[in-house]
Amino acid sequence: MIRAGAAAALVVWLIAGIAPAMAHPHVFITASATFVFAGDKIAAMRVEWLFDDVFSDTVIQDHDANHDGHFDKKEIADIEAHAFTAVKDFHYFTYLWVAGKMIEPIHVRDFSARQANGLVTYSFVVPLPEPVDPRQAKVQAELYDETYFVQVDLDKPHPVRFEGAGHGCQGKVTKDAKRRYYGGVIVPDQITVVCGG
């Protein structure tokens, strides 16, 4: 194991691919999605994960090398390499559709991590293959881990935000029964971007 803490345990589990039947939530994430506009089109989605206190504490202990309560660039790069990159094999717990077609593979950029009040937040950007006008093509997103090793819940009361020219847009959250997972027990939340005009 690269490190003794939970951050490394999560990565090792992701790489090893423990069977879903053996999994249950060990890490808890409160997630939000920010749709980033370029002009009147969605160019990307920024995802934020706020971790539970137990996992946060381990990330801080493992990666805040100078114990100053802040992650510097080197520490963030260390977190990305050892406690984020392997999630690529699990779609970064992020699913995006444009006009009903899933975007595959998911690419991410601009990873960052920060800590506040003992809790760690990851942030990363998922660019769309090309900018999309949500008034012309339906844009939808879901954030979850289908193995249920990590429980991902949308932030309340602000699961969806807009940046740029997203005026008149809102994020409608519904349950997507067609994508039940973990033996059909868990029904993921689906975000649909709805824009007037």
Question: Model-found features: residue ranges?
Answer:
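N-terminal secretory signal peptides that target proteins for export/translocation
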Residues: M1-R3
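Bacterial N-terminal signal peptides
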Residues: G5-G17
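Sec/Tat signal peptide C-region and signal peptidase I cleavage site
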Residues: I18-A23
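Short, solvent-exposed beta-strand/turn "edge" segments of beta-rich domains on protein surfaces
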Residues: H24, F35-A44, S112-N117, Y181-G184
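Early extracytoplasmic/domain-onset interaction patches
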Residues: P25-F51, F55-D57
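Acidic, glycine-anchored loop motifs typical of Ca2+
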Residues: D62-K73
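Short, well-structured hydrophobic secondary-structure segments
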Residues: A77-L96
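Mature, soluble, non-transmembrane domains
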Residues: F93, W97-G197
